[in-house]
């Protein structure tokens, strides 16, 4: 029912109609990938594209370049993608899901590695509309579902590779989320996951009081040992740390495309190693887990 309701709201959204009008123009478009997702249409319909893009703010993941229009997103998402890029050969000719896919930036980037099928899950109408705007021009075979991680066990397909980036700390039951990821895998499937974490040798997690880095829906920020235990409890047998990285103001920052605050406003102005609440400043661990 939730999917049907979201799908109905999405299809009735006025910007969806505008994107469909743009799509009907069937503009010739050169699609290329660098740090940004690049679309060249010889500036056809540029006024319409700019107007839709502005109405779809905030743009979190990217960047995107459409002719002379540069959508300078809050996150320089190529930084995260480049951390995972050495492992992207694992998606070649595989059935791949991106859970919490936002506007599809990572999926567009994954096309370079020739997945057999690429499906994004995110129950956000705005992010889906951003994806539809880009894909109206790019014309890729990527599929986008207005679904969440909890829908994976009952989904019609199982996946060889699942990406779940920046989701688990938003879940009040992280072990159930990991079990849902596991239930969405084919035999010998693999999950690539990243989360914020705390530096601690103990098997513990930070439970923020009300907000973490001014974000209200952060439930648990685990140590790496605690994260490993979560994965084992969910039934994963292999756990590999691929990288760790502190989030800095080069990777996440305020731009004209978000109309709100960003990382610089979320840290202690006197000590950038702390959040405004006094917790450790955000840093991320990237892992690969297998069943």
Swiss-Prot record:
Protein's name in the database: tRNA U34 carboxymethyltransferase
InterPro entries per the UniProt record, alphabetical: CmoB, Mo5U34_MeTrfas-like, SAM-dependent_MTases_sf
Biological role stated in the UniProt entry: Catalyzes carboxymethyl transfer from carboxy-S-adenosyl-L-methionine (Cx-SAM) to 5-hydroxyuridine (ho5U) to form 5-carboxymethoxyuridine (cmo5U) at position 34 in tRNAs.
GO terms of molecular function: transferase activity, transferring alkyl or aryl (other than methyl) groups
UniProt source species: Campylobacter jejuni subsp. jejuni serotype O:2 (strain ATCC 700819 / NCTC 11168)
Positions with a binding annotation for carboxy-S-adenosyl-L-methionine: 61, 75, 80, 100, 122-124, 149-150, 169, 284
Gene3D superfamilies: Vaccinia Virus protein VP39 (3.40.50.150)
Protein's GO biological process: tRNA wobble uridine modification
Reactions accelerated catalytically: carboxy-S-adenosyl-L-methionine + 5-hydroxyuridine(34) in tRNA = 5-carboxymethoxyuridine(34) in tRNA + S-adenosyl-L-homocysteine + H(+)
Keyword Amino-acid biosynthesis: no
Superkingdom per UniProt: Bacteria
Subunit structure: Homotetramer.
Enzyme Commission (EC) number: 2.5.1.-
Protein's UniProt keywords contain Transferase: yes
Range of residues in the leader sequence: none
């Amino acid at each position: 029912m939730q999917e049907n309701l979201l799908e109905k709201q999405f299809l009735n959204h006025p910007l969806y109609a505008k994107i469909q009008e743009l799509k009907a123009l069937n503009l010739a478009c050169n699609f290329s990938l660098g740090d940004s997702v690049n679309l060249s249409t010889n500036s056809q319909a540029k006024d319409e594209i700019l107007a839709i893009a502005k109405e779809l703010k905030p743009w979190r993941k990217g960047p995107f370049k459409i002719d002379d229009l540069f959508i300078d997103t809050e996150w320089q998402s190529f930084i995260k993608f480049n951390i995972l890029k050495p492992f992207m050969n694992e998606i070649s000719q595989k059935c791949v899901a991106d859970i919490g896919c936002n506007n599809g930036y990572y999926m567009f980037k994954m096309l370079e590695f020739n997945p057999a099928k690429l499906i994004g899950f995110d129950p956000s109408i705005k992010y889906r509309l951003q994806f539809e705007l880009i894909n109206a021009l790019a014309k890729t075979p990527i599929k986008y579902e207005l679904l969440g991680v909890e829908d994976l066990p009952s989904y019609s397909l199982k996946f060889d590779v699942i990406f779940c980036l920046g989701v688990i700390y938003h879940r009040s039951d992280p072990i159930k989320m990991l079990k849902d990821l596991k239930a969405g895998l084919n035999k010998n499937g693999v999950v690539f996951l990243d989360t914020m974490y705390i530096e601690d040798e103990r098997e513990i997690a930070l439970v923020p009081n009300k907000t973490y880095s001014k974000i209200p829906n952060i439930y648990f920020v685990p140590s790496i040992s605690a994260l490993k235990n979560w994965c084992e409890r969910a039934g994963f047998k292999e756990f590999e740390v691929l990288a760790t990285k502190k989030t800095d103001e080069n990777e996440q920052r305020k731009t004209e495309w978000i109309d709100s605050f960003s990382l610089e406003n979320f840290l202690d102005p006197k000590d950038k190693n702390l959040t405004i609440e006094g917790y450790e400043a955000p840093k991320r661990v990237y892992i690969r887990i297998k069943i």
